[in-house]
C-alpha cells in the first residue's frame, strides 16, 4: 500500500513539475503576478495607516484594529484571482497548443493527471498570496502597526490556503469541460463572484470579532474544497477532452433529458405519484435517514446550548420586551397571519435550500436545514424563560402543523444533499451535465410530489387550526 502511494505521488509530481516548468519559463506569467503581488500590499499598508490615524483621531480605534486583519485577508485573496488564469488553461490551453495528446496518451491514471494539474495550479496562487502577506506584514512592521493576534493570523492563512485550493479546483474543472481558453476565462466568473461573496461574509465575521464563527467558516471551506476536488476527479475523462471540439447550447436535449428523468416510466399522473416518487424516495432513503439524524442532533445541541446560556440571552432583552412577546391569537402578530403568507414563507425557505445547495454540493442547503432544526430546539428553553409551559406550547403550537412541515423540510434537504453526492460520485457513462440534470429532476420529483403538498397542508393547519389550539391551551 505504501509502495502504491509512493508511486502515485511520484506520478502526480511528474505532471506537476512539467506544468510548473512551463509556467516558470514564461516571463509574461511571472512578471504580472509578482508585480501586482508587491504593489497591492504596499497600497494596503498605506490604507491601514491612514485608517488608523483617522479612527484614532475620532476615538474609534476598534475599527482600525479589525481593519488590519481584513486587509490581510484581501491581500491574500487578490493574488489568487490574478493567478487563476494558469489553472483555467491547464487542460484546454494545452489542447489549443496541441501538446495535450502526449500527456493523455501516457500510462498515467486520470486522477494522477488531475491531481498533478491541481498541485501545479495551486502552487503559483499560494506563492503569490503568501508573498503578498509577507510584504503586507513587513509594511505593518515598518509603520509600527501592531500585527493581528496569532488566532487571526492562523485563520487568515488557513482560509487563504483553502480558498486557493477551492478556486483552483473549480478552475481546473472548468478547464476540463471548456472547449477553448476564451470560454474557460469567461466561465471564471462562476468562481470569482461566489468567492468574492464568501470573502464579504468572512469580512463581516472579522469586523464582528467572532472567532468561533470564523473557525466554522474554515470547516465549511474545507468541505467545499474537498468536494469540488472530488467532483473534478470523478468526472475527469481524457477521451472527452480529445473528442470535444465545440459545445452548443442544446436546450432541446436539456429539456428532453430532464423530462425523461422526471417522468420515468410512468404512463399517467397517478402512476407517477404511485411509482416514480416513491422509487426516488427509496433511492434516497439513506440520505433521508442521515438528514433526520443530523437534524435531531442539531435540535438537541441547540436545546442544550440555549438551556446553558438562557440567562445571557435574556439579558440582551429588557424584561418588559420579553413580557410583551405575542403569545396568543389576539396579538398583533397573529392578526397578520394568513395562509398565503405562511405558505409563501415556507416555500421561500425550501427554494433557498435548493439554490444554496446547487452552488455548494448540498452543503449550504444542509446548513439552512440545520439552522431551522436548531431554532426548534432552542425555542423550548426560551418559552420556559418567559413563563409559559414549553411542552404544552410545543404540543399545541408547533406539533399540529410541524408533523407536515418538518418532513417536508427533511425531504427537500435530503434531496439536495443527494444531488451533491451524485455530483461527487464517479459515473463513467454519464457526463457532468447529465448527472446534474438528472439530480435536479429527482429533486423536482420530491419537491412537487411530496414537499409542496406537505407545505400546503402545514400552512392550512398553521393558519386555521394551530391558533385555535394554542388559544385554548394558554387559557
Give, region by region, the residue ranges found by the protein language model.
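Aromatic- and glycine-rich beta-strand/loop motifs that create alpha-glucan
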Residues: 1-35, 245-246, 256-287
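A structural motif at transmembrane helix-loop-helix junctions in multipass membrane proteins
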Residues: 24, 28-31, 90, 145-193, ...
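Hydrophobic alpha-helical transmembrane segments of multi-pass membrane transport/permease proteins
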Residues: 25-51, 70-83, 190-202, 291-301
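Transmembrane helix segments
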Residues: 35, 42-50, 166-219, 223-226
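Interfacial/capping segments of alpha-helical transmembrane domains
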Residues: 48-58, 299, 303-327, 469-472
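Membrane-interfacial helix-loop-helix connectors in multipass membrane proteins
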Residues: 50-67, 134-161, 206-209, 381-396, ...
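Selective transmembrane-helix segments that form parts of the transport pathway or gating/packing helices
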Residues: 78, 83, 108-139, 292, ...
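Transmembrane helix boundary and interhelical loop/hinge segments in multi-pass membrane proteins
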Residues: 84-104
Amino acid at each position: 500500500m505504501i509502495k502504491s502511494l509512493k508511486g502515485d505521488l511520484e506520478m502526480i509530481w511528474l505532471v506537476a513539475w512539467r506544468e510548473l516548468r512551463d509556467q516558470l519559463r514564461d516571463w509574461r506569467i511571472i512578471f504580472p503576478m509578482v508585480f501586482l503581488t508587491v504593489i497591492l500590499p504596499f497600497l494596503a499598508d498605506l490604507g491601514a495607516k491612514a485608517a488608523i490615524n483617522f479612527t484614532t483621531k475620532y476615538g474609534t480605534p476598534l475599527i482600525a484594529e479589525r481593519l488590519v486583519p481584513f486587509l490581510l485577508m484581501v491581500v491574500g485573496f487578490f493574488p489568487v484571482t490574478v493567478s487563476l488564469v494558469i489553472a483555467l488553461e491547464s487542460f484546454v490551453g494545452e489542447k489549443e497548443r496541441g501538446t495535450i495528446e502526449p500527456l493523455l496518451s501516457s500510462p498515467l491514471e486520470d486522477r494522477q493527471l488531475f491531481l498533478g494539474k491541481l498541485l501545479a495550479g495551486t502552487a503559483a496562487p499560494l506563492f503569490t498570496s503568501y508573498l503578498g502577506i509577507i510584504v503586507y506584514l513587513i509594511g505593518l512592521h515598518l509603520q509600527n502597526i501592531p500585527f493581528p493576534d496569532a488566532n487571526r493570523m492562523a485563520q487568515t492563512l488557513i482560509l487563504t490556503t483553502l480558498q486557493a485550493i477551492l478556486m483552483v479546483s473549480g478552475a481546473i474543472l472548468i478547464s476540463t469541460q471548456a472547449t477553448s481558453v476564451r470560454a474557460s476565462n469567461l466561465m471564471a466568473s462562476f468562481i470569482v463572484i461566489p468567492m468574492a461573496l464568501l470573502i464579504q461574509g468572512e469580512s463581516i465575521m472579522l469586523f464582528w470579532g467572532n472567532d468561533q464563527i470564523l473557525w466554522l467558516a474554515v470547516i465549511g471551506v474545507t468541505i467545499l474544497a474537498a468536494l469540488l476536488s472530488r467532483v473534478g476527479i470523478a468526472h475527469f475523462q481524457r477521451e472527452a477532452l480529445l473528442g470535444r471540439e465545440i459545445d452548443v447550447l442544446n436546450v432541446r436535449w436539456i429539456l428532453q433529458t430532464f423530462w425523461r428523468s422526471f417522468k420515468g416510466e410512468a404512463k399517467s399522473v397517478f402512476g407517477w405519484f404511485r411509482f416514480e416518487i416513491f422509487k426516488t424516495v427509496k433511492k434516497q432513503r439513506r440520505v433521508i435517514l442521515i438528514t433526520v439524524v443530523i437534524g435531531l442532533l442539531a435540535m438537541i445541541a441547540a436545546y442544550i446550548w440555549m438551556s446553558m446560556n438562557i440567562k445571557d440571552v435574556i439579558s440582551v432583552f429588557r424584561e418588559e420586551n420579553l413580557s410583551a412577546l405575542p403569545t396568543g391569537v389576539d396579538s398583533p402578530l397573529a392578526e397578520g397571519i394568513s395562509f398565503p403568507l405562511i405558505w409563501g414563507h415556507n416555500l421561500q425557505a425550501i427554494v433557498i435550500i435548493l439554490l444554496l445547495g446547487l452552488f455548494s454540493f448540498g452543503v449550504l442547503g444542509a446548513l439552512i436545514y440545520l439552522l431551522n432544526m436548531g431554532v426548534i430546539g432552542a425555542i423550548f428553553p426560551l418559552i420556559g424563560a418567559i413563563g409559559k409551559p414549553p411542552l404544552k406550547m410545543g404540543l399545541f403550537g408547533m406539533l399540529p402543523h410541524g408533523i407536515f412541515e418538518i418532513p417536508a423540510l427533511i425531504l427537500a434537504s435530503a434531496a439536495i444533499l443527494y444531488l451533491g453526492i451524485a455530483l461527487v460520485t464517479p459515473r463513467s457513462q454519464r457526463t457532468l451535465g447529465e448527472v446534474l440534470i438528472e439530480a435536479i429532476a429527482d429533486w423536482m420529483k420530491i419537491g412537487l410530489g411530496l414537499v409542496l403538498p406537505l407545505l400546503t397542508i402545514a400552512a392550512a393547519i398553521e393558519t386555521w387550526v394551530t391558533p385555535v389550539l394554542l388559544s385554548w391551551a394558554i387559557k
